[in-house]
Design a protein with these regions (language model features):
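Bacterial N-terminal signal peptides that target proteins for export
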Residues: 1-13
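Low-complexity, intrinsically disordered/propeptide-like segments
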Residues: 6-8, 17, 96
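Bacterial N-terminal signal peptides
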Residues: 11-22
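A short hydrophobic/aromatic micro-motif that marks alpha-helical segments and, especially, helix-coil
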Residues: 21, 136, 274-277
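Sec/Tat signal peptide C-region and signal peptidase I cleavage site
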Residues: 22-28
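N-terminal secretory/targeting leader peptides
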Residues: 29-124, 142-373
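A gly/proline- and charged-residue-enriched helix-loop-helix capping module
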Residues: 123-139
């Protein structure tokens, strides 16, 4: 379940590089319509890996479609994720990089793939798009919500909890106000007797400063943005504290108005960007742990839990997350939760730790780009 940070994870990933689909010069030479698009996200600016990927997208867009511009809005500066979801559905927002679970207030079925203990290896997470559950959700978004999903991207494999104190055992959460990322995480935090507070990341720094929250559930990349206010960060690897995933999406009402050649180039650029994000995500996790990792939980920094410590937290949650999700879904959709759990177990078995191309990425190529402060 752990990130295997102490192993030789920096082997050259030629298969990964080959998987990146470059924008075809032949297509790019066709008559393309310049686009000016807004890209909404609910995570902090660089060095957050997804933010660096969006920065890459913004730089590449005018290169492949001359005259185009991407306006990036971080940390809910333009819309929260539910607001972005609604805006895309109505054709009032072009694109969004969103956390699936945060779309639940608008499309409850998105919660079916969210929660701890389902996809618990790097390879399993990278195989999310192969699941029937994910594919059914993508089809539903297109049919019912008029939202086009390009694909899934990775959230940190070091999702965890940060604060001015260490959150390690269930009793560490008792009575504490902890920022939750969405409704499914509320069930986990409540099981640990914490008081979950749902808020966009842009509100977190001031909430920590004022005492509105005592800690926050976030990614390693998110923690870097509040490290001075929340110097203790605890993680247990993929699926320990939570399981949630990014999806990159666009408004179909906007997308369908674009000429086919423009769509083709944009599609390839988005896939290129998702691939870039997966590499950056892994390397930010790895390089952050190398700089701030600690094996002593009494000291500040990133503490990687032992399997026994992870099990203690997971056992306290039990099936609370699944029960919560089912309680919020219509009766004909509750089967999605069990279906995804079954698919997750199969993917974990098929993708043991250390077997994924992600774990073999050569992070040295990003040494000049990723600056961990």
């Amino acid at each position: 379940m752990a990130l295997n940070l102490d192993r030789g994870v920096c082997a050259a990933a030629f298969a990964c590089a080959a998987a990146v689909t470059a924008v075809s010069p032949a297509v790019a030479q066709e008559k393309l319509k310049p686009v000016v698009l807004r890209f909404a996200a609910d995570f902090s600016p660089p060095p957050h890996p997804a933010a660096m990927a969006l920065q890459y997208f913004a730089e590449r867009l005018p290169q492949v479609i001359p005259g185009s511009q991407a306006r990036i809005y971080y940390a809910g500066a333009l819309y929260t994720i539910p607001e972005a979801f609604e805006a895309m559905r109505q054709g009032n927002l072009e694109m969004s990089w969103m956390q699936m679970g945060k779309a639940a207030p608008v499309e409850p079925r998105m919660m079916a793939v969210v929660g701890p203990g389902v996809l618990t290896t790097v390879g399993a997470v990278d195989s999310l798009e192969k699941t029937k559950t994910y594919q059914e959700l993508v089809a539903r978004l297109a049919t019912n919500q008029h939202i086009k999903v390009f694909g899934a991207a990775h959230m940190s494999f070091g999702m965890g909890v940060g604060g001015s104190k260490r959150y390690l055992k269930p009793e560490d959460f008792t009575g504490r106000k902890v920022r939750s990322m969405g409704p499914v995480e509320n069930a986990s935090l409540s099981s640990w007797k914490a008081s979950p507070v749902v808020m966009a990341f842009g509100e977190v720094p001031s909430a920590l400063q004022s005492g509105v929250i005592d800690g926050l559930m976030t990614s390693i990349g998110g923690w870097l943005a509040v490290r001075e206010q929340a110097p203790y960060y605890t993680t247990g690897g993929a699926g320990a504290f939570t399981g949630d995933y990014y999806m990159v999406a666009a408004s179909e009402r906007w997308w369908n108005r674009l000429p086919k050649p423009t769509q083709a180039v944009l599609e390839k650029l988005v896939q290129e960007t998702i691939q870039k994000e997966k590499e950056l995500n892994w390397c930010v996790d790895k390089m952050t742990y190398e700089k701030y990792g600690t094996k002593d939980p009494s000291k500040p920094g990133v503490y990687w839990m032992t399997p026994q410590e992870v099990q203690q937290l997971v056992a306290a949650v039990g099936d609370a997350s699944q029960r919560y999700v089912k309680s919020k879904l219509p009766p004909d959709a509750t089967g999605l939760v069990d279906q995804f759990a079954k698919e997750g177990r199969a993917l974990d078995k098929a993708n043991p730790p250390g077997s994924s191309w992600v774990e073999k990425i050569d992070c040295s190529k990003y040494a000049g780009q990723i600056v961990i402060k």
